[in-house]
Each structure stands twice: as C-alpha cells, then as structure tokens.
C-alpha cells in the first residue's frame, strides 16, 4: 500500500530533473500572471530574444493596480495605466490569453482561475503572488514565486525548487454558527505561529475541512503562507468535483469521467507518512480578530489582548511593537474597538459566499455614522452573480459602497487606501504596518461577516449577536 501524500504524488508526476545542490526542476502545469510582477520578467525574455515556452499554459489578468470606483481607460494613475498597457502588449506579443476588464472573466487572479475551472486537482500552479497557495484547495500544489522565477517559468515552464516536508493539520468537530473559515485559519496561525510552516507544505484535513465548501477551503489555503508554509492543500473529494463540473475550462464528457478517477487517485493515502502532525477541535473555535501587526497576533472575540507576560519570550518584542503601533492596551477587550473603515473583499474573502454572509448581517441595518464601508467583489463573475441575487442593493441600502473587482485595499497599490491612523476592519489577509496604504493605518483582520458587523455597529462586534 502506498504511503505517499498528495504532495508526494504531484511532485513525482511533475519532476523533470534533479539539480546539483538538492533542487528539482519541476514542470509547472499552470502559470498565472498579472500586471505587477510580470513586466520585468517579460523584459528579461525580450532582452534575450526568448519567447514564452507554453503560452497555452499561461493566463493573465489585471487586479492589483486597478481602481474599483471607475475602471474607464485610461486610468487617472499614469503608472497604473502604463502597467496595464504593458501587460496587454506582452500578452499580445506572446499569444497569452488575457482576461481584460469587461471580458466577464477579469478579477483577482486567485478568484478567476478557480471559478473558470482553470485550477484543477493534480496541477502544479505558479504565480508571482504570495497567496497562490489558494489553489491548493483543489488538491493542487500551488506556489507563490518572485519576478525572476516568473521569468524562468515563462522561458522554460519549469521551476527549480527544493522538496518540502509535509505537515498535516487535522480538525475534529465542526465550526459553530457564526464561525467561519477565516476564523479557523486565523486560529491556526495564532496557535502555531507565523514561522511554523517554514520548509513545509500544510495538508488541511479532518471532518471540519470535509464539511467546508470550496470557497471556504480556498480561504484556508490562501492564508497557509501567513503561517510560514510555502503551500497548503486539501485532498480533492466530491465537493471539489461538484464545484468544477461544468465550468468553462473543466474537462467535458468522457474526459470528465476520466479526470474524476485520476483526481481521486491523487488523494493522500490512508497510510501516508507525514513529517509532522497537529490536531485542533474546530467546534471550540470562536470568531477571531487580529489585534497586532502580524496575522499570528489574533484572539477570540470574547478574549482580551494578551499581556507581555502571558506570551512566549520570542513573541514579547513584536507584541510590544504591536501595542505601540496599534495603540492598544494589554489586557483590554478586542470587542468594542471603534472602526473607521470596513473593507470586504480580497483573494481571501471576495467570493460570492463571502458576500452572501456579509449581506445577511447588513440587511435591514445601517452603516454606523462616521464609518466608511465598501464591498469589492473578487471578480466580474462574482459581481454579476451577487447583483443577480440583489446583494449589491442590500449593501447599498445599508450604506456600503458597491465597487468594481480588484485587489483594492488589501494591499493599497491602487486608490483604495487608509488615511492617517485610521483603523480598518478588513476581510483581507495581512495586517502588517502600512499594509493598507497609510504608514500609520491600523488593520484588524476578520471574516466578512465580522467586518459587516463592525460596519453596522461602528466597532468590533461579535457577529453571533447579530445573527437571526
């Protein structure tokens, strides 16, 4: 009986050659590119007179720098316009499929690839973006890469990588009402730390994971990188197959039946050997909010901000830095902290089900006075589906702004930015200093439903109090 994990199986299937020094040349099945990390890579190709090795395995979109109010061209920001134009020209020159604004397929790269069926089990996927691990939710091995590696994949369709160890994170029980996938992954990162996963791939498994939708699973894998892991994945199952069936790039007819048989064979063997394993009880997890300046600095909504003495010595210095930057007192409650801005969106939580959960809280309520709240769908398809359900109307009646697709305030490489020392409740993935556009801006990460709760109450609020 095989003792291989899914990671082992996919690695072996995509191994091209061994490289002196311990690295492996790995074939990349799908390469996703965008406007920020691709220009220099294309320039390097052009300088050497090289062409893209597998344009049919390369897909482009624009997401990081696009404005979310009006997306009429040219963009007011000349640099953003130049970056988009450069991507358009590079895609045209190298015959790369480009999901442009208005195509119906444009959006955040980690939202559009799954929803179009491009992301499939058994693939190796690379993208010049940290949160490429999102695609591991489908039983693929997905890596974020740097610009020089984007160049390498464009030129050779391969990457030089060292094989990771595999850590299984098992979840017994099930999430309680008002607790979501975002709470689960924030809880894991808080317990294990932001460096626990260095050198590892995380395999997420157990009854709690089995019970999640694909969109919830994507949230989990999206933030594996925040725990230090190079990638995170979930074994493919019926939930995976049901999600993929009928999508534009999914296999059709007899090929679909063949694909399912193959995908099922990729799941980690029952006798698989892991390098490490840890267990959690999902039923004990509460709505979770970050209080500091790393995704690992989080607490349950009904808990108090930790005191330095209660922390491990290795965590005390960053905690002292966080208290000062966030202007929060150790021992104080996270609930009740006033909020200036509420952002719902990102590759972590900008999908239809995320917006549905937030809309449930916003419905028949009003955004609190003095709070700016806005919703940014993760893609044009998400926006279209949400609008067909009337979610845009629910949000707008409540006082939220309904925006156009893009990365938006997750990273503030576009007009959506915090000002001065504003505090934001955000459904994104990083709360680093200055992450949302202001050197003094403060970010508290939470689920979309929790963001909506903060918007209508004006402060951090336990969403369970607002559920019908």
Swiss-Prot record:
EC number: 4.2.1.33
GO molecular function, one term: 4 iron, 4 sulfur cluster binding
Pfam families: Aconitase (PF00330)
Cofactor, how bound (note): Binds 1 [4Fe-4S] cluster per subunit.
BP terms from Gene Ontology: L-leucine biosynthetic process
Cofactors required: [4Fe-4S] cluster
Residues annotated to bind [4Fe-4S] cluster: 347, 407, 410
Pathway assignment: Amino-acid biosynthesis; L-leucine biosynthesis; L-leucine from 3-methyl-2-oxobutanoate: step 2/4
Entry's transmembrane regions: none
NCBIfam families membership: leuC, PRK05478.1, PRK12466.1
PANTHER family xrefs: 3-ISOPROPYLMALATE DEHYDRATASE, HOMOACONITASE, MITOCHONDRIAL-RELATED
Name listed for the protein in its UniProt record: 3-isopropylmalate dehydratase large subunit
């Amino acid at each position: 009986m095989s003792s291989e994990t899914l990671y082992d199986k996919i690695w072996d299937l995509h191994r091209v050659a061994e490289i002196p020094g311990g690295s492996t040349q790995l074939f990349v099945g799908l390469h996703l590119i965008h406007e920020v990390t691709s220009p220099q890579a294309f320039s390097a190709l052009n300088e050497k007179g090289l062409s893209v090795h597998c344009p049919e395995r390369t897909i482009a979109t624009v997401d990081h720098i696009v404005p979310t109010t009006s997306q009429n061209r040219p963009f007011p920001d000349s640099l953003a316009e130049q970056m988009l134009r450069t991507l358009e020209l590079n895609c045209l020159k190298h015959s790369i499929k480009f999901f442009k604004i208005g195509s119906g397929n444009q959006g955040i790269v980690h939202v559009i690839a799954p929803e179009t069926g491009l992301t499939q089990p058994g693939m190796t996927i690379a993208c010049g973006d940290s949160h490429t691990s999102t695609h591991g939710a489908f039983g693929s091995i997905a890596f974020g890469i740097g610009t020089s590696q984007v160049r390498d994949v464009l030129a050779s369709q391969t990457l030089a990588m060292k094989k990771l160890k595999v850590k299984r994170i098992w979840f017994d029980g099930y999430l309680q009402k008002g607790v979501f996938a975002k709470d689960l992954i924030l809880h894991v990162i808080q317990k294990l730390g932001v460096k626990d996963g260095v050198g590892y791939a995380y395999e997420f498994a157990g009854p709690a994971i089995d019970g999640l939708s694909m969109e919830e699973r994507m949230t989990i894998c999206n933030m594996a990188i925040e725990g230090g892991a190079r990638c995170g994945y979930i074994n493919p199952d019926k939930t995976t197959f049901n999600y993929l069936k009928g999508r534009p790039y999914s296999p059709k007819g007899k090929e679909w039946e063949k694909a399912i048989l193959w995908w099922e064979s990729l799941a980690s063997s029952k006798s698989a050997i892991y390098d490490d394993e840890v267990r959690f009880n999902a039923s004990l997890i509460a709505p979770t909010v970050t209080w500091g300046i790393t995704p690992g600095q989080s607490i349950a909504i009904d808990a108090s901000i930790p005191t330095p003495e209660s922390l491990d010595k290795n965590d005390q210095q960053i905690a002292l830095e966080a208290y000062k930057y966030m202007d929060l007192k150790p021992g104080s409650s996270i609930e009740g902290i006033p909020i200036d801005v509420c952002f719902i969106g990102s590759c972590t939580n900008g999908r239809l089900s995320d917006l549905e959960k937030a809309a449930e809280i916003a419905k028949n309520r009003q955004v609190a006075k003095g709070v700016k709240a806005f919703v940014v769908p993760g893609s044009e398809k998400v926006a279209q589906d949400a609008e067909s359900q009337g979610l845009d109307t629910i949000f707008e009646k409540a006082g939220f702004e309904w925006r156009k697709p893009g990365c938006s305030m997750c990273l503030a490489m576009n007009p959506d930015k915090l000002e001065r020392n504003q505090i934001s409740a955000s459904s994104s993935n990083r709360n680093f200093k200055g992450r949302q556009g202001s050197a003094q801006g403060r970010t508290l990460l939470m689920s979309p439903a929790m963001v909506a709760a903060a918007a209508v109450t004006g402060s951090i609020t336990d969403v369970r109090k607002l559920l019908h």
